[in-house]
């Protein structure tokens, strides 16, 4: 074992060109051997060289982060309003300026705390994706986190591995390594014994051992970490939707401001300061200041929920794409099956008279590896009475993804040479009869897919049959075939793909959502958007439903934001233009400040009834629903103002005092009406059914009660000359609550009307489709996983449905 001083010497000598000197010189300089390091020596070297990972980006100083959140594009509009208040408003401009600054600070603090929580969630998820590697320590192979590797370690590299360090290859045949992301070279590069492989490159073919020569920041590249960062930073459709919604809100406010300026200043010849106050009402009340942060936090909080159910999101915005998937392509091995092979000895067929079944098994086992075994190797070696029989001196020809074959040359006890091949050719499969049983859960899982809009259908290929199949794919699809299938499906569908191997990498990258199953190769994990930590199909169903719930939560908030903007702009604009009533900017500011508490609750609310069909953030739906809700609420606000300020309807009906001509009390009454209705709207939006059928989240309900208790108390007792308000008493407060309750119910009816107009008969069509799929699926118990020896195809589901039916679903084996 190397001493502390010699380890320091190693660190100095590593600066030499270890990739160029003879391999024996590498072992000398690194003070190591082909038997690997001991555990104790590995720990000592880890102290000297540090962990095998890139340094994390330094966290921005709290002050810089705070100001970055405060000076966002939407905040600029509010800041402009603060400057307008300071320069042009009436004598209360200074107080209004301070109030707007207070709103900005409160919003920024909430955003800061939420984004801090979000960062912790992302860090937790990434910790679950730490790359693994097989390392030789204390003479034994074991799977360890790649971060423990140090120069001098011996590692095993196999197809699908992302090489975790810079290393020199040891004895063996060759590796094919894809280093295009590092060097730009197209296609795999062949590497032989003694050559260097780089951290972050992907092993495509072959299996060799290597000695580590550089780790962490000392490697040629940090591609592994870069892969995750790149995918996390993709925004695409989500960013577009947020930008479009922001633009709609700003344009609506700009239209309202333009109309007010033209009518109030040039037509009505009103005082300039009154015009400014009315403009401030539109700007302060209409800008959805917290929307970008709220949507981001909803997604990150949702990713934590997914993490707890066995799903890690590498790209946050993949949650939106996951909710929209209507075609899910699945690999067979390990997903539909257990990926635990067994050998059925009773089905072994021997074609040579001089060979026994036991000898066939022995030959297959000798063609398998003892250490670092894959599923097939483990099945073959495990079929022997004594696994030690499988070994003598051997020279290996490693598994080849192109030929799908491996071969070993060995010498038996008599000194005779033998060569044994193991692979996928039909004659070898017939000899060994390897069997990969279907998961017991696959029947119910596919049924659940159909019930939730993920339409999974036939996966079969019959040469001689009268059965019409919806989709048919041959056995042993290659990587290129999968890629083209996904590409074709994406012309009409949002396509998800489940994969696990290096051959799935191009398709995983191409798919709208790439999903790596549990125990997938490092290359597949790096190429995917979502990584599963639990086996089987049920976890995917949970992930889809959770994604739809998260997306629905985001949709609820965006509709709410658009509705409030439309309501504020057109409600207060008509009141100001028709009756020349100038609502106090202070009261709009009070509504905005109290809404911050509800905004925080929205991010924590749980959706109990997510969409039963694939869903997405559709701008048409968001805009149409928001405009209808906002216009209706603006209308009932205008009607309330007219009835309370211009008529005696309320005094005659409820025996409350007359507010006609009393501007200060009317200000309080209008404030309470707007405050209640604004927040009550969310109870309608958050439910797919009647609002009273689906109970809102406890935090959201508690927030509503708290905020409206404060608002009601303020309206009843407040007397503030600067804001031009005077308390209206409990009688008027009760009347306003009753008025809002009466006009609240039509919002639910409007919700169903909007949904019907936007979707038409789509919902009924989908219900018919689900029944069709379930009826077809009933045949699964009789026809599932039939292995036809004549043409070597697998039938997972027979469907006698005409191809013209709009059935969506793909799988391959």
From Swiss-Prot:
Subcellular location: Membrane
Positions on the Cytoplasmic side per record topology: 1-66, 116-245, 294-555, 606-622, 686-697, 748-813
Positions annotated to bind Mg(2+): 500, 504
Topology versus the membrane: Multi-pass membrane protein
Single GO term (MF): ATP binding
Transmembrane segments: 67-86, 95-115, 246-266, 276-293, 556-577, 583-605, 623-643, 665-685, 698-718, 727-747
Coiled-coil spans in chain: none
Principal location listed in the UniProt entry: membrane
A GO CC annotation given for this chain: plasma membrane
Residues at the catalytic site: 331 (4-aspartylphosphate intermediate)
Entry-annotated residues carrying Phosphoserine: 776
Pfam families on file: Cation_ATPase_N (PF00690), E1-E2_ATPase (PF00122)
Residue intervals on the Extracellular side: 87-94, 267-275, 578-582, 644-664, 719-726
Disulfide bonds: none
Keywords, in A-Z order: ATP-binding, Magnesium, Membrane, Metal-binding, Nucleotide-binding, Phosphoprotein, Transmembrane, Transmembrane helix
Family annotation (InterPro entries): ATPase_P-typ_cation-transptr_N, ATPase_P-typ_cyto_dom_N, ATPase_P-typ_P_site, ATPase_P-typ_TM_dom_sf, ATPase_P-typ_transduc_dom_A_sf, HAD-like_sf, HAD_sf, P_typ_ATPase
Protein family (similarity comment): Belongs to the cation transport ATPase (P-type) (TC 3.A.3) family. Type IIIA subfamily.
Official protein name in the record: Putative ATPase, plasma membrane-like
Organism: Arabidopsis thaliana
């Amino acid at each position: 074992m190397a001493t502390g001083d010699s380890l320091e010497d190693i660190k100095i000598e590593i600066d030499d060109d270890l990739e160029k000197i003879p391999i024996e010189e590498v072992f000398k300089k690194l003070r190591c051997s082909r038997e690997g390091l001991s555990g104790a020596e590995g720990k000592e070297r880890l102290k000297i060289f540090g962990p095998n990972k890139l340094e994390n980006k330094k966290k921005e100083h709290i002050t810089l982060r705070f100001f970055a959140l405060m000076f966002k594009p939407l905040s600029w509009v509010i800041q402009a309003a603060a400057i307008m208040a300071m320069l042009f408003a009436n004598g209360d401009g200074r107080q209004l300026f301070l109030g707007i600054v207070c709103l900005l600070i409160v919003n920024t603090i909430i955003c800061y705390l939420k984004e801090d929580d979000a960062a912790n969630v992302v860090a937790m998820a990434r910790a679950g994706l730490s790359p693994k590697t097989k390392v030789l320590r204390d003479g034994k192979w074991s799977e360890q986190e790649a971060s423990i590797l140090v120069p001098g370690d011996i590692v095993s590299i196999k197809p699908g591995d992302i090489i975790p360090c810079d290393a020199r290859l040891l004895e063996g045949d060759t590796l094919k390594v894809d280093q295009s992301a590092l060097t730009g070279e197209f296609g795999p590069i062949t590497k032989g014994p003694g050559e260097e492989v780089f951290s972050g490159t992907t092993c495509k073919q072959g299996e060799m051992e290597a000695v580590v020569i550089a780790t962490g920041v000392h490697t040629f590249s940090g591609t592994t970490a870069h892969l995750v960062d790149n995918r996390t930073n993709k925004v695409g459709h989500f960013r577009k939707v947020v930008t479009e919604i922001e633009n709609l809100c700003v344009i609506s406010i700009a239209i309202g401001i333009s109309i007010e300026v033209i009518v109030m200043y040039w037509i009505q010849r009103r005082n300039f300061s009154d015009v400014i106050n009315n403009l401030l009402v539109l700007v302060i009340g209409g800008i959805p200041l917290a929307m970008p942060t709220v949507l981001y936090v909803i997604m990150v909080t949702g990713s934590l929920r997914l993490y707890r159910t066995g799903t890690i999101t590498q790209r946050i915005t993949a949650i939106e794409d996951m909710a929209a998937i209507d075609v899910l392509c699945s690999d067979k091995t390990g997903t539909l099956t257990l990926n635990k092979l067994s050998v059925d000895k009773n089905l072994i067929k021997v074609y040579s008279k001089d060979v026994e079944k036991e000898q066939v098994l022995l030959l297959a086992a000798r063609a398998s590896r003892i250490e670092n075994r894959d599923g097939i190797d483990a099945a073959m070696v495990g079929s022997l009475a004594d696994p030690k029989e499988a070994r003598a001196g051997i020279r290996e020809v490693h598994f080849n993804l192109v030929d799908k074959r491996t071969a070993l040359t060995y010498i038996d006890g008599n000194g005779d040479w033998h060569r044994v091949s193991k692979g996928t050719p039909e004659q070898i499969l017939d000899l060994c009869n390897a069997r990969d049983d279907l998961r017991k859960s696959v029947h119910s899982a596919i049924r659940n897919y159909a019930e939730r809009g993920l339409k999974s259908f036939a996966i079969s290929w019959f040469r001689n049959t009268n059965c019409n199949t919806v989709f048919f794919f041959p056995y042993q699809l290659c990587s290129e075939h999968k890629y083209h299938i996904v590409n074709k499906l994406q012309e009409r569908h949002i396509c998800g793909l489940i994969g696990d191997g290096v051959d799935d990498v191009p398709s995983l990258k191409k798919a709208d959502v790439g999903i790596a199953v549990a125990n997938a190769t490092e290359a597949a994990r790096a190429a995917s958007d979502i990584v599963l930590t639990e086996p089987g199909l049920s976890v995917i169903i949970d992930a889809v439903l959770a994604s739809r719930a998260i997306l629905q939560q985001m949709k609820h908030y965006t509709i709410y934001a658009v509705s409030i903007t439309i309501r504020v702009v057109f409600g207060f604009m008509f009141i100001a233009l028709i009756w020349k009533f100038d609502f106090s900017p202070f009261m709009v500011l009070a509504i905005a400040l109290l809404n911050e508490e509800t905004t925080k609750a929205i991010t924590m609310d749980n959706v109990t009834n997510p969409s039963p069909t694939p869903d997405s953030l559709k701008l048409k739906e968001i805009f149409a629903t928001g405009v209808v809700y906002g216009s209706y609420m603006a209308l009932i606000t205008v009607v309330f103002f007219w009835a309370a300020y211009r008529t005696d309807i309320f005094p005659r009906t409820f025996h409350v005092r007359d507010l006609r001509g009393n501007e200060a009390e009317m200000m309080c009454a209008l404030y309470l009406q707007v405050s209640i209705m604004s927040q009550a709207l969310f109870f309608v939006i958050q439910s797919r059914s009647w609002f009273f059928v689906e109970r809102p989240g406890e935090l959201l309900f508690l927030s509503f009660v708290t905020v409206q208790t404060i608002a009601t108390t303020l309206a009843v007792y407040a007397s503030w000359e600067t804001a031009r308000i005077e308390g209206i008493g409990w009688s008027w407060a009760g009347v306003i609550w009753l008025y809002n309750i009466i006009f609240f119910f039509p919002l639910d009816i409007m919700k169903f009307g909007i949904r019907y107009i936007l979707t038409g008969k789509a919902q009924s069509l989908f219900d018919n489709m689900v029944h069709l799929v379930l009826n077809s699926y009933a045949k699964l118990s009789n026809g599932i996983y039939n292995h036809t020896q004549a043409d070597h195809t697998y039938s997972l589901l027979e469907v006698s449905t005409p191809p013209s039916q709009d059935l969506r679903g793909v799988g391959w084996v």
